[in-house]
């Protein structure tokens, strides 16, 4: 199964440095919407997922690069 098939709303999202990034609020195809801990809402691609375990999604992004990624997509 693909990692995105294990994601559901309410899952917590973390960076590869184990910093909390936000919470999944919805899934649209190969993307999921996330409410960030910094107040920024964003869409992330499922291909950027590192692992999904026990309602915990770990992204390949560091917390700094994710913020830059979200801002560049606005």
Give the predicted meaning of each segment:
Residues 1-74:
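Peripheral interaction segments used for macromolecular assembly
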